[in-house]
């Protein structure tokens, strides 16, 4: 048992996005299977969870970050240490969607890379009647970034585990590419981004996030 723990791979995941998009709710739902319905602006919280992804044990170190502009100076610090990023916006807020490009550009600048493991996450898909950002817009933005896209609901636990698991897969793929110098085959796929449909969570409400895809 001790020998196995010695080789336990740790992944540093960072959840970024504007204020009020549900970053903390998404993170706590993933870590604790609990929905936090009150909004309490986060400065910075760290969580750890051990799980199995594609038959490999992984220790996830998840950093939930501040979305408010006044904490912007802290961003570069966690961007330097993060191995992968969930870029979260709310489908009910066009402003939060537009902020995603700023976060993405900052990550690439801090990392001094043309690409890096990220996933665009459209949260609050249970609030379809308040939608301001179309699914195709999120998918197109992710395609522009060269990454995957997923719609989630922290409240109804829709695609929450899938968002974090797929980010770990992207980190693994990125690391293989860095080691071999050539593109790796995506886990669970084999085609380019956007080539397969994400299964909806079994607890999903009818009509919510219909046809959620990772693109």
UniProtKB/Swiss-Prot annotation:
Its main location: membrane. Residues 179-199 are annotated as: Disordered. The modification Cysteine methyl ester is found at residue 212. Residues 213-215 form a propeptide. GO terms for molecular function: G protein activity; GTP binding. It is an enzyme of class 3 (hydrolase). The keyword Lipoprotein applies. Its EC number is 3.6.5.2. One of its GO terms (cellular component) is plasma membrane. A lipid is attached at residue 212 (S-farnesyl cysteine). PROSITE patterns: RAS. It is found in: Cell membrane. A motif (Effector region) lies at residues 39-47. It comes from the Eukaryota. CDD domains: H_N_K_Ras_like. NCBIfam families: small_GTP. Ras proteins bind GDP/GTP and possess intrinsic GTPase activity. Belongs to the small GTPase superfamily. Ras family. This is 24 kDa Ras-like protein.
């Amino acid at each position: 048992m001790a020998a196995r723990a010695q080789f336990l791979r740790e992944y540093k995941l960072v959840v970024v996005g504007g204020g009020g998009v549900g970053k903390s709710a998404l993170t706590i739902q993933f870590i604790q299977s609990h929905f936090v319905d009150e909004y309490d602006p986060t400065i910075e919280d760290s969580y750890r969870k051990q799980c199995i992804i594609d038959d490999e044990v992984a220790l996830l170190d998840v950093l939930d970050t501040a979305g408010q502009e006044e904490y912007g100076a802290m961003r570069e610090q966690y961007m330097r240490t993060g191995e992968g990023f969930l870029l979260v916006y709310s489908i009910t807020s066009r402003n939060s969607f537009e902020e995603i490009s700023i976060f993405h550009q900052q990550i690439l600048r801090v990392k001094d890379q043309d690409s890096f493991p990220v996933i665009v996450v459209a949260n609050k898909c249970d609030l379809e009647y308040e939608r301001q950002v179309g699914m195709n817009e999120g998918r197109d933005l992710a395609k522009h970034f060269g990454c995957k896209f997923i719609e989630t609901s922290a409240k109804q636990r829709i695609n929450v585990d899938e968002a974090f698991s797929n980010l770990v897969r992207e980190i693994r793929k990125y690391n293989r590419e860095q080691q071999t110098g050539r593109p790796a085959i995506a886990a669970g796929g084999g085609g380019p981004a956007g080539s397969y449909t994400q299964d909806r969570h079994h607890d999903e409400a009818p009509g919510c996030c219909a046809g959620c895809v990772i693109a």
